[in-house]
């Protein structure tokens, strides 16, 4: 979604501020697009909101920015209730996907725009512009115009303009979606470096790209149909997703039918009947019953055991696809299809071969249907 507004010009701020959404609700013409949502983003934290188109993630960001009036709930930035404050009084800055640079202004003047709107002293403006351009690696381009820059360079300038006003919070609305793959990859690294240099900055990052979220975020929230259906630390959410949608949206996952048999002597692990075998898996919920699912990431499967506690599925190889450093195998496990991704496989197995697929108990997660 392209937006003409580029940034919310923040008043100069000191220290760090988090974001608290308290039962935030948004409706357009009586149609609820964001169901009551409660979420806390800690000071200095990067939270990525991901989800399919129409899931509500951009609505959340626009509500925090002040461009959407909530139908209910509260928005706090730091200790301040900003629910009914105009955007320019919220102490934040925003970067969107279409850069929205002023074409008639040089790079340095684009970066200085928010500071001049604040009527800051000239010496301070020059200092902040110099620092911001240095931070994003654009010092040598200060006197160029936007049309003389690549897409990646323009986005760096947009980020420099946002951080120059020293916001408490930085909002990023799919800032890399208009870039090609290689530039997008480089910009992900640039944003990660930016946060290392500005660790006090709280960032709300909206994206549909799971790689961006996994690379940049301390925590991830997954949206679906106007609701937050999963939220947690990035690694924990990836390795132990709470439900099928989260498992399949955040990376590729094998989802198999399973029956929980009961707890084991190891905290967090349960015995599970799955794939024609009794295995052990991680569980966050109930430990008994039918209608469960087992989630295993393709890269967590191997052709050799990694420990004395490894689980094993017996499988028949259906197809092999070699892709340079990676080999993708499609296997049949008790009538269900299982994908695995391997590195440095030599020799390659052949279609029809009988294989043993090994995986660690903590890499298999029992989830609800």
Swiss-Prot record:
InterPro entries referenced in this protein's UniProt entry, alphabetically: AAA+_ATPase, ABC_SmlMolc_Importer, ABC_transporter-like_ATP-bd, ABC_transporter-like_CS, AminoethylPonate_ABC_PhnT, Mo/tungstate-bd_C_term_dom, P-loop_NTPase, Transp-assoc_OB_typ2
Highest taxon above the source species: Bacteria
Signal peptide per UniProt: none
Single GO term (MF): transmembrane transporter activity
Binding site for ATP: 51-58
Gene3D superfamilies registered for this protein in UniProt: 2.40.50.100, P-loop containing nucleotide triphosphate hydrolases (3.40.50.300)
Keyword terms: ATP-binding, Cell inner membrane, Cell membrane, Membrane, Nucleotide-binding, Transport
SUPFAM superfamilies: MOP-like, P-loop containing nucleoside triphosphate hydrolases
Regions crossing the membrane: none
Localization per Swiss-Prot or TrEMBL: Cell inner membrane
ABC transporter domain span: 19-250
Membrane topology, from the record: Peripheral membrane protein
Gene Ontology CC: one annotated term: ATP-binding cassette (ABC) transporter complex
Broad class of the protein's primary localization: membrane
Function recorded in the entry: Probably part of the PhnSTUV complex (TC 3.A.1.11.5) involved in 2-aminoethylphosphonate import. Probably responsible for energy coupling to the transport system.
Family assignment from sequence similarity: Belongs to the ABC transporter superfamily. 2-aminoethylphosphonate importer (TC 3.A.1.11.5) family.
Record's protein name: Putative 2-aminoethylphosphonate import ATP-binding protein PhnT
Gene: phnT
């Amino acid at each position: 979604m392209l937006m003409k507004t580029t940034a919310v010009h923040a008043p100069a701020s000191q220290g760090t501020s988090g974001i608290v959404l308290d039962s935030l609700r948004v409706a357009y013409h009586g149609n609820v697009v964001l169901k009551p949502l409660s979420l806390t983003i800690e000071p200095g934290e990067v939270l990525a909101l991901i989800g399919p188109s129409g899931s509500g993630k951009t609505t959340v960001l626009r509500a925090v920015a002040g461009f959407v009036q909530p139908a209910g709930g509260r928005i706090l930035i730091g200790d301040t209730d900003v629910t009914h404050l105009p955007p320019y009084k919220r102490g934040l800055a925003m970067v969107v996907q279409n850069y929205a640079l002023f074409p008639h202004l040089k790079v340095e003047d684009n970066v200085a725009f928010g500071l001049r709107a604040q009527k800051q002293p000239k010496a301070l403006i020059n200092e902040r512009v110099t620092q911001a351009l240095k931070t994003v690696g654009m010092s040598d381009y200060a006197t160029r115009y936007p049309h003389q820059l690549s897409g990646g360079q323009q986005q760096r300038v947009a980020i420099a303009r946002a951080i120059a006003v020293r916001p408490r919070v930085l909002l990023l609305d799919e800032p890399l979606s208009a870039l090609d793959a290689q530039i997008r990859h480089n910009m992900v690294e640039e944003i990660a470096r930016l946060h290392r240099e500005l660790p006090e900055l709280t960032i709300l990052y909206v994206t549909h790209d799971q790689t961006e979220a996994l690379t940049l975020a301390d925590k991830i929230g997954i949206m679906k149909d106007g609701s937050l259906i999963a939220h947690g630390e990035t690694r924990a959410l990836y390795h132990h997703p709470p439900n099928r949608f989260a498992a399949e949206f955040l990376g590729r996952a094998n989802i198999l039918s399973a029956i929980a048999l009961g707890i084991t002597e190891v905290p967090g692990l349960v015995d599970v009947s799955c794939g024609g075998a009794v295995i052990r898996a991680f569980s966050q919920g109930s430990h008994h019953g039918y209608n469960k699912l087992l989630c295993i990431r393709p890269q967590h499967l191997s052709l050799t055991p990694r420990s004395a506690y490894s689980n094993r599925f017996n499988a028949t190889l259906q197809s092999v696809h070699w892709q340079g450093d990676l080999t993708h195998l499609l296997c049949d496990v008790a009538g269900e299809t299982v994908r695995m991704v391997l590195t440095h496989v030599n020799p390659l197995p052949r279609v029809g071969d009988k294989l043993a697929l090994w995986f660690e108990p903590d890499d298999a997660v029992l989830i609800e249907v």
